[in-house]
Regions:
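N-terminal signal-anchor module of multipass membrane proteins
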Residues: 1-56
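Juxtamembrane helix-loop boundaries in multi-pass membrane proteins
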Residues: 2-25, 62-88, 105, 121-148, ...
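Membrane helical hairpin/interfacial module
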Residues: 34-102
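Alpha-helical transmembrane segments in multipass membrane proteins, preferentially the mid-helix core
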Residues: 115-119, 148-149, 173-182, 205-212, ...
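Loop-centered beta-sheet repeat module
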Residues: 139-183
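Glycine/small-residue-rich hydrophobic helix-like segments
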Residues: 211-259
């Protein structure tokens, strides 16, 4: 029985971390719309934590799958959602145990930065623009989840602002490249097409992160991010007409977080 479970765990898809992130974020977002007294956020965080717990089992029992994922041009860009989910969980944990929440937040940020570094190194070894897919936004810009979940510790605020500007700079560089890749290079493979939904996330995430850590936000920057966020979200809603007709795959997890963070940014 243990041997059977051992091999079943090996088959867990890495995009499960993206789904965990989406569920945890959705639970938090629902707190803005419904009088849930914190239970929506807590429920989403617990579900997300259980889901990434299964991935921890997989990575622990099968180290080779983690390294294979990190080297893959698509799956490797999804791995950081594991750390992003932990950041969202840290916000919930902070309500009950503030010190534990800060420690978890710091650990998740360091984990994300490590995944980002590995992703960049692997991609520089094979710098082909046709391999680029929208999930490539996740490693450099997903770090801004650290700003959205910032634990309100004054000494960490400068670091959180640096993380925001890192994400903003990466978006400014990657967005034109991504648009060029999608319009002028070979079509994204069917297996990676669900990641197109991620296009809706970066501007919304940057907007939510900026409004969280900046007490005196620039109206121009807010208007710019808001405009891009709305445009990208509307485009992806129309794209769902085709994306939802694709054969189901774990990549469908890419549909969750972009919608949740878009709603969160609007509430901000």
């Amino acid at each position: 029985m243990f041997k059977k479970l051992h091999y079943k765990v090996r088959g867990l898809p890495t995009p499960l971390a993206g789904l965990a992130l989406g569920i945890a974020s959705l639970g938090w977002c629902l707190e803005n719309a419904l009088p849930l007294a914190g239970w929506g956020q807590t429920t989403g965080a617990v579900i997300g934590l259980v889901m990434i717990g299964f991935l921890v089992l997989r990575f622990t029992a099968h180290h080779d799958t983690l390294w294979a994922d990190l080297k893959h041009p698509v799956v490797g860009s999804i791995v950081p959602t594991f750390a992003m989910c932990l950041m969202v969980v840290s916000k919930t944990a902070g309500h009950w145990m503030p010190e534990a929440g800060v420690v978890l937040w710091c650990a998740a940020v360091l984990l994300h930065l490590a995944a980002l570094g590995i992703f960049v190194v692997n991609r520089l070894q094979e710098p082909r623009l046709e391999l680029m897919v929208p999930s490539w936004f996740v490693p450099p810009i997903g770090i801004v989840v650290a700003d959205v979940t910032f634990p309100e510790v004054a000494v960490l605020l400068p670091f959180a602002k640096i993380l925001f500007w890192m994400g903003a700079a990466a978006y400014a560089v990657l967005l034109p490249l991504m648009i060029y890749r999608l319009f002028f290079l070979p079509e994204v493979p069917n297996g990676a097409k669900p990641t197109i939904a991620i296009l809706a996330a970066p501007a919304s995430l940057l907007l939510a992160g900026y409004l969280t850590v900046e007490k005196d936000p620039s109206l121009l920057l807010v208007a710019l991010l808001f405009g891009i966020a709305i445009l990208m979200t509307v485009v992806i809603y129309f794209a769902f007409w085709r994306l939802l007709r694709l054969q189901f795959s774990p990549g469908y997890a890419a549909f969750t977080f972009p919608m949740a963070i878009g709603a969160t940014a609007l509430y901000k």
